[in-house]
């Protein structure tokens, strides 16, 4: 296992060294150091087994970094500038040997992870800029574009396996069920889409919700589907009940721009206000704040292969790492204790709030809409 994902070793001062040749001890941090890019990242992904992080930026460049809690050991391994416009999404293959990227230039690229060599390019893969990417298995991938188009690709073949256009707006995000049968899509038209990729057919669209659906993920062991929205609301659907929502949970956030599951009940959201919120699903609670990009929107979130680190990208051109240990230890009780109004949002890591951070006055989420939330939760907390 990589050192970063192990417990940090205890310092051993038993070894004697020549004072004249002693070097300053290596500092071990709680999280890797921030990575500073030349442009904001618009795609982010962790390697499935190694301590590597890939990022694609709005200039079309793709980077792969090795990260470590040892100070000075987080480094760029390589970069690629093959895309002509913004790189919108990046994803590692299941075996970790390939990196797939998609771009506003309508192209799909497959890169070798070790050297960054471009192995395959599918030019004009869509008629519109590509916005989202999901790898189904080692050979098959799905892409969604700005006009609502969905395409399924087999890297061993020429041309798409499936080409659908049921949505009226851009495809913001996609998710897959464990059986790799149903592809779920979140769209700017406010609808959740369901596509059977085994039979290569369209199944249904949900009722449109208020605002764009910006993200989608499975929760509660696949029994629930959660969608984030541009209105700052999380919409919940029952599995096999995709036509209409079963519940909704409004955060006090301008929007939910990205979302990543941490456990079967906990997820993290990134918002325009720069705050990364930890949210429990059923019972619906904002648990606290994992971190923030001060005054800058959070565009992407990703969870490391060991689950220890959350990475975030903001318009401040920084990639930040957050320790998930404290969040994973949180226990959310079904009973809601009425908190004092005006209390601060609970910090879930040592570096959540900086001393000069104007977000330090951020108030507890949802207190003035408590009654509405409790009403919405009633009768739906059980699966």
Curated annotation (Swiss-Prot):
Residues with Phosphoserine modification: 14, 354, 382
A Pfam family per the record: WDR55
One cellular component (GO) term of this entry: nucleolus
InterPro entries, sorted: WD40/YVTN_repeat-like_dom_sf, WD40_repeat_CS, WD40_repeat_dom_sf, WD40_rpt, WDR55, WDR55_POC1
Main location: nucleus
Subcellular localization: Nucleus, Nucleolus; Cytoplasm
Biased composition (Basic and acidic residues): 1-11
Record-linked SUPFAM superfamilies: WD40 repeat-like
Chain positions found as Phosphothreonine: 378
Region listing for Disordered, in residue ranges: 1-33, 362-383
Domain of life of the native organism: Eukaryota
UniProt entry keywords in alphabetical sequence: Cytoplasm, Nucleus, Phosphoprotein, Repeat, rRNA processing, WD repeat
Start-end of Acidic residues biased regions: 12-21, 365-383
WD repeats: 36-75, 82-121, 125-163, 166-205, 208-247, 250-289, 293-332
Protein's GO biological process: rRNA processing
The UniProt record lists the keyword Oxidoreductase: no
Family: Belongs to the WD repeat WDR55 family.
Function field: Nucleolar protein that acts as a modulator of rRNA synthesis. Plays a central role during organogenesis.
Name of the protein: WD repeat-containing protein 55
Source organism (scientific name): Pongo abelii
